[in-house]
Amino acid sequence: ILANGRILKGKSLGCQGTTVGEVVFATGMVGFEETLTDPSYYGQIITQTYPLIGNYGMNSEDKESGKIWAKGYIVREACTTPSNFRSEETLDTFLKENGIIGIEGIDTRSLTRILRESGVMNGAITTEFDPEAEPEKLAALMPIIKAYAVTGAVDAVTCTEPQCFAPTAGVAEGEEPLHIALLDLGCKKNIVRCLCKRGCRVTVLPASTTLAELKALAPDGLMLSNGPGDPAENVQVIANIRDMLDTGIPAFGICLGHQLTALAAGAKTCKMKYGHRGANQPVTDFALERTFITSQNHGYAVLGDTCLLYTSPSPRDRQKS
């Protein structure tokens, strides 16, 4: 059930019940387990544009966090007989274990077109009533759908205590590894893995970390992770980052971390019409005159007239990033 009144019927996937969230679409053909467990999807109902999901199953190694953060899951067809030597369970079982309500068998191409043309919008998945046969229940649910908003997202997904990780490779004998402070705004496990594989010692910090707490660690660099929600909502985090940038510690932001860094430096952000979510997003570096295919997951962008370095080459989507 979409906020604009459109109703799409399908078959229950995962748990029974009703869930409300912001409906978005992701264009990846693979990586569905990473998508589901990515904290950046907090509060959202994910639509997979690729028609068959779950064909290589789910496993305990590919999770980007300890749970599913999305509010719901929409697929054209969920595979019930996955085939892969690493597979441990089906998509349906994984959703049920995490208490997630999903739906399959709907026209995901049609839904994606709606979101592309109208922009992402709120919606609901329900197994509790037929909205066409019971209009009074639909009328009661619609105000809840329309009023839904993703708020307090960073506070919900960040860690509560610092966590330390040792390098797994890349450190010569007798050398001290670089120490990276990683501000957890909704951090994916793979960011930590990539840093450790490159010889870094990583300290993951809560989003509320202050300048004094950062200085006490004396890191060689600061990384700000991905994360969910409206970047402008995180007023205190932005103020803390501004103080951190003034120290001269080399800093690098990914996704929400990039947006918060931009806000701390005086730039502005905006909500995109339907965002970039998938592993096939083109980005042009005008200085190098090269286009790269990138993996992205964000619904907000830094306004180009305040801080432009890279932009999408697509004439239909000139969102700055």
Regions found by a protein language model. Give the residues of each.
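RNA-binding accessory domains that recognize and position tRNA/RNA substrates
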Residues: 1-179, 185-200, 205-208, 212, ...
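Active-site environment of divalent metal-dependent phosphoester hydrolases
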Residues: 189, 301-303
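Cysteine-nucleophile active-site neighborhood
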Residues: 216, 220-221, 225-301
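Glycine-rich active-site loop/lid that clamps phosphate-bearing ligands
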Residues: 304-309
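Conserved small/polar residues in nucleotide/adenosyl-binding loops
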Residues: 310-315
